[in-house]
Amino acid sequence: MSDTLKRLQKIVSEQLSVDPEKVTSTADFGKQLGADSLDIIELIMTIEYEFNIDIEDHYASKITTVQDALNYIENKIKQK
């Protein structure tokens, strides 16, 4: 498991108040982790801060699973 995934799982678990074991790569933020639209906005903002990246609005709406977020973060880090 990559360090990025571990950090992301910790962030998601804390932000959404869910058991870390439920934060799998295929977990959907809304359907499986119980996030509403405000939770997702706050989660995106926390990810931006913690990973020092910007997530453009048109991409933010496409990030629905932990894997989506991980892919986006890793791509942004590679671009730096």
Swiss-Prot record:
Its principal location? plastid
Pfam families linked: PP-binding
Q: Which PROSITE patterns match?
A: CARRIER, PHOSPHOPANTETHEINE
Q: Does the keyword Lipid biosynthesis apply?
A: yes
Q: Which UniProt keywords apply?
A: Chloroplast, Fatty acid biosynthesis, Fatty acid metabolism, Lipid biosynthesis, Lipid metabolism, Phosphopantetheine, Phosphoprotein, Plastid
Show the GO cellular component annotation of the record.
chloroplast
O-(pantetheine 4'-phosphoryl)serine is found on S37
Give every Carrier domain span. Answer: 2-77
**Compartments where found:** Plastid, Chloroplast
Q: Which residues lie in coiled coils?
A: none
Output the superkingdom of the source species.
Eukaryota
* UniProt pathway: Lipid metabolism; fatty acid biosynthesis
Record's comment on post-translational modification: 4'-phosphopantetheine is transferred from CoA to a specific serine of apo-ACP by AcpS. This modification is essential for activity because fatty acids are bound in thioester linkage to the sulfhydryl of the prosthetic group.
* GO molecular function annotations of the record: acyl binding; acyl carrier activity
Family to which this protein belongs: Belongs to the acyl carrier protein (ACP) family.
Extract the PANTHER family matched here: ACYL CARRIER PROTEIN, CARRIER DOMAIN-CONTAINING PROTEIN
Function according to Swiss-Prot or TrEMBL:
Carrier of the growing fatty acid chain in fatty acid biosynthesis.
Q: What is this protein called?
A: Acyl carrier protein
